A protein has these predicted regions:
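Conserved beta/loop motifs at nucleotide-recognition and modification sites
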Residues: 1-347
């Protein structure tokens, strides 16, 4: 929880500094919300780099193969017709630099020019601070501001979704927006093309759940939720149909099994919640849910299952997981279909 508060604080401070025109010198941009990250990179560029002078004042380089000597040389270049320069370095894993390069980076941070803004962007590489490298960790903690772009809060995301749909000539209410988030995930990067697709398909002014279900491309978790809901109702045909859709998308059977197991664990905890008098808020806290929508769906599905069924289902998943990881030549797709049949028969 403390980590989340620190990450949120860094993000909010960055936004405030950007708005006030008091941007710092060195930033580390990380987190899975790439849409938001790219948006703010453009905003920083607008703030610091005058149009027409990008060639002199803005440099975006790949981190792979970049030396700290080259980076230092870029930071020392004076701005032209501007107060500051902007350098964006993508996927330079700072904690995997060799000792000499770490030393040069520390020296650069200790005497960093005020007229330069340097942003290390972690896109495909995950940012993992490593306290083993004490001097580098201390230098980055002191001189660089970490800005973590995470999925937005429920209310902020619903408002953003509504604005995007208004741009397509449609409205969407909060409950329908929650269904979209559940179906397509909560990352803006993934939602943008889905909103455009749904906006082009919808006939009425108001977007409906049916519009979303008709054309949206659901994320793996959403499909598996529908699959487990089908087996709790004993509907093997529907569960098998959904499994077939995932396999056509080239999803790995071991990955599908992992998500099925996770969903059944969530269903088990929902059953425990019902049996012990706990509510959706307990489930939301347990599974770190940003919205009560999936919690309500879980409780609804749990009412159709028993404690014994949940325990037996998890045992079947664990057994198949061990077999998939240890047996050679196993028909993984066939075993998944058999698992769904067993789950549906016991429901």
């Amino acid at each position: 929880m403390a980590e989340k508060k620190t990450a949120a604080k860094g993000y909010q401070k960055f936004k405030a500094d950007l708005a006030a025109g008091t941007l710092g010198e060195v930033y580390i941009f990380c987190g899975e919300e790439s849409y938001l990250r790219e948006y703010y990179l453009k905003e920083v560029q607008k703030k610091l780099v005058p149009a027409g002078f990008e060639e002199f004042n803005f440099h975006r380089v790949a981190g792979k193969g970049l030396t700290m000597e080259e980076l230092t040389e870029m930071t020392e270049a004076m701005p032209m017709m501007a107060e500051r320069t902007l350098i964006v370095v993508t996927d330079c894993d700072l904690y995997k630099l060799g000792e000499e390069q770490r030393t040069r980076l520390i020296a650069l941070l200790d005497d960093f020019p005020e007229y330069c803004c340097l942003i290390f962007v972690y896109d495909l590489v995950e940012y993992k601070p490593n306290k083993t490298y004490k001097k580098l960790y201390a230098a980055l903690s002191d001189k660089a501001q970490e800005v973590r772009f995470e999925p937005q809060d429920k209310s902020d995301l619903i408002n953003w979704i509504a604005r995007r749909f208004r741009a397509t000539g449609h409205d969407i209410d909060a409950r329908t927006a929650e269904h979209l988030m559940f179906t397509c995930g909560s990352l803006m990067t993934g939602l943008v093309p889905e909103i455009e697709k749904i906006g082009a398909y919808a006939k009425g002014r108001a977007v409906t759940v049916e519009d979303i279900n008709a054309v949206a491309d659901p994320v793996l978790d959403a499909v598996v939720f529908d699959m487990t809901s089908a087996v709790t109702k004993g509907d093997y045909d529907r569960a098998s149909e959904l499994l077939g859709q995932l396999l056509k998308k080239q999803e790995e059977p071991i990955m599908i099994l992992g998500v099925i197991s996770k969903e059944l664990r969530r269903l088990y905890t929902a059953r425990l919640a019902l049996d012990s008098g706990k509510d959706k808020l307990w489930l939301m806290d347990l599974w770190n849910m940003r919205s009560d929508y999936p919690a309500r769906l879980l409780l609804e599905a749990a009412r159709k299952s028993t404690h014994e069924w949940c325990v037996n289902s998890l045992a079947l998943c664990q057994k198949l997981d061990r077999r998939m990881k240890s047996e050679k030549g196993i028909d993984r797709e066939g075993e998944l279909k058999l698992l769904l049949m067993q789950l549906a028969q016991r429901a």
